[in-house]
A protein has these predicted regions:
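ABC-type ATPase nucleotide-binding domains, specifically the catalytic core motifs of the NBD
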Residues: 21, 39, 100-120, 128-133, ...
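Conserved ABC transporter NBD signature motif
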Residues: 65-73, 85, 118-120
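Conserved catalytic motifs of ABC-family nucleotide-binding domains
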Residues: 160
């Protein structure tokens, strides 16, 4: 779906083990995501989806293996080095300063990202969000839920990132606003930004994604084009309900998870 022709992976997890103390969440995880694509991470709660984003953003260091961004090993990198590599993270929930204006939130967000000045980039970012632009002097708390999520994404875009990690962007948003957010992510990917996304709204997310990766207990159990998974009528039950998933055989046989989901 992406307009970018890039066979070389932008993101690569190679035998990654990561977790907290003695509890490992990612277990020998390996996968690749190409430049200018949207890769959707699927799986039940506790599968390790959000942990993938956290390890890539340096919030959790791998115990084993390598995480590469265009060949750069991010495993031992500092937050400053990761930002310099162009990795932006939009976590779950609301992470704004409610009493500050839209402009002030963007300005402070730029400072947090280590930028010396954001004045020239703020107008550039606001062009993506016409409704937010109209309320540039309004307090963030006065924005709708959708406008607040757009503002959070806008702060990430100040970095002009080559990779955006986004965790559950549809939470608390109306279907119309979710469609706008997804449309923006697709536009960014088509212009070269690599997007790694966790999203419970599986069918809608698959429609804008290029690849889908299914995790279970921190392990890769399936990776295939999103369009192929979208054709499965049991897709949401399959990847949110914890059914064990295995890749389809070369002759097109159904996955074991599809068979389980189809059973009465």
């Amino acid at each position: 779906m992406s307009l970018i022709n890039a066979n070389q992976p932008c993101i690569e997890f190679d035998d990654v083990v990561a977790g907290y103390k003695d509890f490992m969440i990612l277990n020998n995880l390996s996968f690749k995501a190409k430049k200018g694509t949207i890769t959707l991470l699927l799986g039940p709660n506790g599968a390790g989806k959000s942990t993938v984003l956290k390890t890539l953003f340096g919030l959790l260091k791998p115990r084993q293996g390598h995480i590469l961004l265009d060949g750069f090993d991010v495993g031992g990198a500092t937050q400053k080095q990761l930002l310099a590599q162009g990795i932006a993270f939009v976590p779950q929930g609301r992470n704004l300063f409610g009493q500050l204006s839209v402009f002030e939130n963007l300005e402070l967000g730029g400072i947090t990202l280590g930028m010396k000045t954001t004045h020239e980039r703020i107008p550039e970012v606001l062009e993506f969000f016409p409704r937010v632009k109209e309320r540039i002097n309004s307090a963030a708390s006065a924005l709708s839920g959708g406008e607040q999520k757009q503002l959070e994404i806008g702060r990430a875009l100040l970095l002009r990132p080559k990779v955006i990690l986004i965790d559950e962007p549809s939470i608390g948003l109306s279907p119309m606003v979710v469609a706008d957010v997804f449309k923006l992510l697709r536009k960014l990917a088509d212009h070269g930004t690599t997007v790694l996304m966790v999203e419970q709204n599986v069918k809608s997310a698959l429609k804008i994604s290029d690849e889908a990766i299914a995790l279970e207990s921190g392990r890769l159990v399936l990776q295939k084009p999103a369009s192929e998974l979208l054709a499965d009528p049991h897709i949401e039950r399959l990847f949110l309900g914890g059914a064990h998933t295995q890749a389809a055989s070369a002759n097109g046989a159904p996955t074991t998870a599809s068979a389980a989901a189809a059973a009465p």
